[in-house]
Amino acid sequence: MRLEEYAEGIYVGYRYFDSFGIEPLFSFGYGLSYTEFDIRLCGINTASKGVTVTVEVENTGTTYSGKEVVQIYASLPQDGSRKEFRRLVGYEKTEELKPGEKEMLNIVLPAKAFASFLEEQQEWRIQAGAYGIWIGNSLSEAKLSAGVKVSADVMMEKTKKLEDHSEVVEIKDCAEELCRRAEEWTALLEELPNVSFEPEAEEKKVCRFSEETEIPVEDLIPLLYGNMSEIRSTLGASGIKVPGTAGETSEALFDQYGIPSLIMADGPAGIRLQQTYEVDREKDTVYGTGVLGSLENGYLVGRKDHEGAERYYQYCTAFPVGTALAQSWNKKTDGTVWTEGCGRDGRISY
């Protein structure tokens, strides 16, 4: 299998278009509304853990209510190294606002959002210099609104290189052009609010285990790849504990360490349950249906009843996948859809 080479480097998605001056048809963060909003910067404050931006959002329309997303992007100091022009560092969505109604938002930008990864040093570092804060409801509409100044370099996190991919030829950066653009926006900071920022390195929690509790590597392998010595594949419809799931690791560590098998999700589409399955009580096993049996509720292979088997049914609620929730730009929705929904399902089934 050929190793996928990501030649774009850090210039992924909107960072590529924004850094190389390519105007897309729809800018990152773009969205339609039945009304219009005004976003106004009210204040900017710093602490060791990050920067807090306070904005006021007003529905300036006359007819419809609506919600607005405030997006904050940051431009980093350009020193000739590989960097993007702007990056998303924070966002928040308002409640539903009636025409003329206002809401104040406090958007926290974590310190590490301003850090750059230095390949040679293998560390995340916030570099000294001026940072531009851009505020708007999309990348193309974001306006330079404030400046954040860091007096000295701060290492946020030290990492360790696990694999060398230096042979990957990445696209040529646009450092020279970005340095020119940086001169333009840094000159504009003189007329805008500026604050000093003295970030502190993160306290990284290190999990340590005694020799008595460490599990040998050969015992951990089944957690990732399943029991390859068994005939049953770890791909397809190989779930045992939860029939229909795309994959399951291993029960090999349960008796000795109390570690159960890991149920695999079928990409972003969930765990792909079978609505019905049969159990052989003599062998205490589930009758497998293969990949085709797990698709379209078994329509492709038809229903087959095994003599003496017990049939079970499991019906589940379909929730929006993570990518759909992310597109709402609503942090509250990301959490409540799952927690409240699962809670209601639990009460109903009980």
Regions found by a protein language model. Give the residues of each.
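Secreted, periplasmic, or luminal enzymes acting at the cell surface/secretory milieu
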Residues: 1-67, 73, 128, 132-136, ...
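Short, hydrophobic/aromatic beta-strand segments
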Residues: 64-72, 84, 117-120
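Intrinsically disordered, low-complexity Pro/Gly/Ser/Thr-rich segments with frequent PxxP/GP/PP motifs
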Residues: 79-119
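Short, surface-exposed ligand- or partner-binding patches at beta-edge/loop junctions that are enriched
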Residues: 108-139
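Second-shell loop/turn segments in exported
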Residues: 205-211, 248, 322-333
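Conserved, mostly hydrophobic/aromatic
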Residues: 216, 262, 330
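A conserved hydrophobic secondary-structure block that centers on an alpha-helix together
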Residues: 326-350
